[in-house]
């Protein structure tokens, strides 16, 4: 697989505006099947970082990631109400890909867009929440790094 989305890092090219690529989309869609679920860091109520795996993480649009949180009472949802800044890490050694996404999260109310997030989530995640009792979270991506170098950033 070509590493086109890391062009800026490998070539020394300029940082570009956030535009989540086809390669990023494919990597995140296959992450759970490949045993490399996305790790998400958020800030707990005491101000400390905490981390969790989110196998439902996927590209929602060119500037947004989405997560389906199966448990509507999950601590993650409570944390992002207080502080919506997140970091999400994707690492796949076999693909030789690493992406660190930084952004801000918002919880969607139930409705059409929330249903879209559920339907676009990994089938295994849907099977664990067949009643769709969870909540959809959108992450506006502000910065993408790969191998320690910023490759995409919003103005």
Predicted regions located by residue number:
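Binding-site signature for planar aromatic cofactors or substrates
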Residues: 2-155
